[in-house]
Amino acid sequence: MEQIILSRKDSITITKSLVTDILLLGVIYMLPTISHLLAFPLYLLDPMRVVIFASILLSASRLNSFILATTIPLFSFFVGGHPVFVKSLLIALELLANLALFWFFYKKGVNVFVTTFISIILSKVLYYILKASLLDAGLLKMELVSTSLIIQALVAVAISLLMALFMKNNLTNTELG
């Protein structure tokens, strides 16, 4: 029977990824409480998307970002009951598409700001197409657009600026992946 032996470097990388994931999940888990204490609806700032982009900056593994994109909405549903399960799946798909598009454009050498912004916008277009389909099918009962498109655009610009700033000034492990 073969035994898998991890190198010290692999063990450290895995440990860092786990610690990063736990911290990021903790932030997401605490958002409703923080939002209540601040009397400000933090969901307007697109915290799940912020977390997946933070994971790009903080994690040594692209796979880690994809795992977070898949699990954060489901974690939120199972722990807090919000958003509803179908919408949680929809958000997970949107975040996965966002990451896939980000890496696609990034590998093509597109400017980080443009890469981030376009990947957010295209993943939101996918989200709204799928959400409209789910609304038409009666699988969701809510408004198509619950957060102002202007606020969403401003948040997309802010995330894009931050990504451009941090990736320019702090060459991260994303360059390795």
Question: Language-model features: where?
Answer:
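Hydrophobic transmembrane alpha-helices
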Residues: 2-57, 63-64
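Short helix-perturbing small/polar motifs within transmembrane alpha-helices
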Residues: 2-27, 68, 89-132, 164
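Interfacial aromatic-anchored transmembrane helix boundaries in multi-pass membrane proteins
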Residues: 29-45, 72-102, 131-136, 144
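Hydrophobic alpha-helical segments of integral membrane proteins
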Residues: 30, 69, 73, 77, ...
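Hydrophobic transmembrane alpha-helices of multi-pass small-molecule transporters
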Residues: 50-54, 77, 95-99, 124-128, ...
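A helix-boundary/kink motif common to multi-pass secondary transporters
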Residues: 60-61, 111
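Transmembrane-helix signature of polytopic, membrane-embedded enzymes
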Residues: 62-70
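Membrane-embedded alpha-helical hairpins and interfacial helices in multi-pass inner-membrane proteins
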Residues: 85-89, 105-177
